[in-house]
């Protein structure tokens, strides 16, 4: 179904899966497996979670990538809340998947969060390959800044900049 599609950027991946991801009322985590030319081999839903979380363990994530003989993959999940900003859990998941991909030789090209008509791309924000601590610092997070799942801004003097863009 996706075999004629080539993915060169976050917008391409979102265009392919926008309809699929918009049908869920809870978080869904999946991967797009790609061949050496960037053509889509398949899309696999790794997990269907709750309203504000979805587990993505490397074991389940890489199962179809390995079976499909993928050269690379793009992780993608939705935020039904409408806020595309990554949570601390999203940062940790990305770091783990990136490191696992390096170990087994399947390159992680991006992790994209889709929320209504906005997206957040880890690649476009230069967060792939960063440690959890580095990514948190780059996003201006600290332990007291924001609980993204509750959208509860704490009054600690830290300003919050939305690192999202409209996906028209």
Where are these regions (language model features)?
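Active-site-proximal loop/helix of nucleotide/amide-processing enzymes and allied scaffolds
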Residues: 12-15, 37, 47-138
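Generic short beta-strand
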Residues: 31, 111, 160-162
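Non-Sec secretion/translocation targeting segments of pathogen effectors
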Residues: 154-168
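Primarily interfacial, aromatic-capped hydrophobic alpha-helices that serve as membrane anchors
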Residues: 137-154
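Low-complexity, intrinsically disordered short peptide segments enriched in small/polar/basic residues
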Residues: 4, 71, 143, 159-160
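Long amphipathic N-terminal alpha/beta scaffold segment
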Residues: 1-41
């Amino acid at each position: 179904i996706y075999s004629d599609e080539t993915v060169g950027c976050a917008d391409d991946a979102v265009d392919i899966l926008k309809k699929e991801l918009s049908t869920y009322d809870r978080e869904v985590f999946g991967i797009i497996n790609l061949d050496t030319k960037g053509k889509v081999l398949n899309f696999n839903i790794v997990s269907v979670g709750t309203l504000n979380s979805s587990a993505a363990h490397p074991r389940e994530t890489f199962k179809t990538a390995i079976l499909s003989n993928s050269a690379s993959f793009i992780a993608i999940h939705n935020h039904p809340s409408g806020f595309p900003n990554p949570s601390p859990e999203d940062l940790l998941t990305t770091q783990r998947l990136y490191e696992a991909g390096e170990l087994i030789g399947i390159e992680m090209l991006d992790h994209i969060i889709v929320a209504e008509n906005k997206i957040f791309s880890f690649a476009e924000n230069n967060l792939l390959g960063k440690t959890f601590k580095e990514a948190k610092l780059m996003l201006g997070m600290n332990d007291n800044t924001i609980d993204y799942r509750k959208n509860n801004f704490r009054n600690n003097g830290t300003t919050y900049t939305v690192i999202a863009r409209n996906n028209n």
